[in-house]
Amino acid sequence: MRHKRSTRRKRASATQLYQTCKAAGTCPPDVIPKVERTTIADQILKFGSLGVFFGGLGIGTGSGTGGRTGYVPLSTRPPTASAPTSTIRPPVSVDTVGPLDSSIVSMIEETSFIESGAPAPSIPTASGFDVATSADNTPAIINVSSIGESSVQSVTTHLNPTFTEPSVLRPFSSSEASGHLIFSTPTISTHSYEDIPMDTFIVSTTSDNVTSSTPIPRPRPTARLGLYSKGTQQVKVVDPAFLTSPRRLITFDNPAFQPTEPDETLYFQHQDISPAPDPDFLDIVALHRPALTSRKGTIRFSRLGSKATMKTRSGKQIGARVHYYQDLSPIVPADSIELQPLSRPVSSASHSINDGLYDVYMDPDTPFPQPSISYSLHSPQTTNVTVPLSSGFDFPFSSTVPLQPGPDIVSPVAPTYTPFVPVIPTSPFNNVLVYGSDFILHPSYFLRRRRKRFPYFFADVRVAA
């Protein structure tokens, strides 16, 4: 069997050795100069290039290709191919700009402007009247030539529906001198659009039945806190510090720093593993703002907390949502009292106070039970008795007093039943006279006590049966 030669492991490059051994100071002597370019050859090229330039010879540490132009003799030049070139001229002649000329070149050609507005009326020119002045007191003589019939000139203007000109008011010109009157009557066409009346969609009425166009404000819907969802843990807190300073239940107090407890969300950072003062607040990273709610007849102070029980490699914290609450005071339900009407229909009548009659229901007289066996099948009855009441003295005047019927009061009546044992015996009745409070029992009623004897046996040993 042929012996297999061991393969030679390749040595690491100088750059790889330099990265690991530079800090430790264990680099071979030929690694640092090669990487930092401080060898003898590098020093010669560095200082020799200051006085000699070998740029076109292609001398360097690269591959021997002769550079970009290749190897050429020192006494000759490489041949160059000449191609006919055309003279480049600007397509448009450029005007020269003098030092005093404006450097702003207008890129927009001059266009004709159209004056907007109504057309200006043409005013005819006339020579007017010839006025002769004289210093003599002679009457003025004016020669008026007959003009003849006056001509009327009409101008018609058509409106462009796609363009509406602004209305321009121009003063009327007086042309009575020449005897010509100018009238301008634009043509008015009927419009093609539809007139729609405006309606009020939101109308509110005040207490004085005054209609206004201000919209009625609606209450903003309250957001649900989700304190009692299935994924929220419910924890009841008994410590009163939960209301004023909940930070004491999560972190330990610092005597040199006493922060205020605002009514907003509190955030906590746990750099090391340390237990909380209250075990219910372990791993709490956020404690949200408080909320007052009413549930099951109590006023409840609630805060929603977030825990960071687990932390992934990406830095995301995963934990449960906890609802911490503390009941402040119970809400006592109102007593349900049946209310009676306070007022009834009032009837007024003129009468005297002494003449008032009142109805009183009287209980019937209970008859003495007789020794007869008879069953009553009828219900008890009440009688209505009218009793006049007097105040003891009469008033000399009569007044109008409103009368209100009072409630009817029925007195309870005991049920009627027949006893099993008659109160009065049916046998011959004998009178019994009692002269004292003591009595003597007849000797025949005394029973003699007899003692019953039981045989007892005592033994110190076990007796065989």
UniProtKB/Swiss-Prot annotation:
Transmembrane segments: none
Molecular function as annotated in GO: DNA binding; structural molecule activity
Domain of life: Viruses
GO CC list: host cell; host cell endosome; host cell Golgi apparatus; host cell nucleus; viral capsid
Major location (coarse): virion
Keywords, in A-Z order: Capsid protein, Cytoplasmic inwards viral transport, Disulfide bond, DNA-binding, Host endosome, Host Golgi apparatus, Host nucleus, Host-virus interaction, Late protein, Microtubular inwards viral transport, Phosphoprotein, Viral penetration into host nucleus, Virion, Virus entry into host cell
UniProt-listed InterPro entries: Late_L2
Entry-linked Pfam families: Late_protein_L2
Compartments reported by the entry: Virion; Host nucleus; Host early endosome; Host Golgi apparatus
Segments carrying motif Nuclear localization signal: 1-12, 447-454
Disulphides: C21-C27
Post-translational modifications: Highly phosphorylated.
GO biological process: microtubule-dependent intracellular transport of viral material towards nucleus; symbiont entry into host cell; viral penetration into host nucleus
Record note on quaternary structure: Interacts with major capsid protein L1. Interacts with E2; this interaction inhibits E2 transcriptional activity but not the DNA replication function E2. Interacts with host GADD45GIP1. Interacts with host HSPA8; this interaction is required for L2 nuclear translocation. Interacts with host importins KPNB2 and KPNB3. Forms a complex with importin alpha2-beta1 heterodimers via interaction with the importin alpha2 adapter. Interacts with host DYNLT1; this interaction is essential for virus intracellular transport during entry.
Family to which the UniProt record says this protein belongs: Belongs to the papillomaviridae L2 protein family.
General function of this protein: Minor protein of the capsid that localizes along the inner surface of the virion, within the central cavities beneath the L1 pentamers. Plays a role in capsid stabilization through interaction with the major capsid protein L1. Once the virion enters the host cell, L2 escorts the genomic DNA into the nucleus by promoting escape from the endosomal compartments and traffic through the host Golgi network.
Name of protein: Minor capsid protein L2
Protein's organism: Human papillomavirus 67
